[in-house]
């Protein structure tokens, strides 16, 4: 058994698709009209046949209060792996992405948290013992 799909709840599918592809660098895998909304998935360009992220409309009545509660408490909705948190932080910040947490070492990982502009906080994380600022170890 393996994970095939994961979802992130978004308040605007077009805006989310632009952010997740043009800013974060994912690739569109599916964009299928389904009535009022679309079935949109994005994938990592490094693993186009891997896990797909569904840009799911947050229209269910429970979705917005759930997202608001997570966001107001500073809790990321999901996390993405990166090779170097500091480099991604610098790249994304230069593109205007707002971060709620700068790169921070948390035990064996370094993390940062960004706002995806669609109602979610997203954590980026770098595994291993290499501090984001020192570039040593591994």
Where are these regions (language model features)?
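Vicinal oxygen chelate
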Residues: 1-5, 27-81, 89-115, 125-138
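Conserved beta-strand-loop-alpha-helix junction that forms the acyl-donor binding cleft
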Residues: 9-13
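Conserved active-site tyrosine of GNAT-family acetyltransferases
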Residues: 16-21, 92, 119
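Conserved catalytic-loop position in the HRD/HxD motif
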Residues: 84
């Amino acid at each position: 058994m393996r994970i095939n799909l994961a979802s992130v709840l978004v308040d605007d599918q077009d805006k989310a698709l632009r952010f997740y592809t043009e800013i974060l660098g994912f690739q569109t895998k599916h964009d299928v009209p389904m009535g009022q909304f679309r079935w949109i998935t994005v994938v990592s360009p490094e693993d186009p046949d891997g896990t797909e992220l569904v840009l799911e409309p947050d229209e269910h009545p429970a979705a917005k209060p759930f997202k608001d509660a997570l966001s107001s408490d500073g809790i990321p909705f999901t996390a993405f792996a990166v090779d170097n948190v500091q480099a991604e932080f610098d790249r994304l910040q230069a593109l205007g992405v707002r971060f709620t947490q700068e790169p921070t070492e948390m035990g064996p990982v370094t993390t940062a948290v960004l706002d995806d502009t669609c109602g979610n906080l997203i954590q980026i994380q770098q595994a291993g013992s290499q501090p984001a600022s020192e570039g040593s170890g591994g």
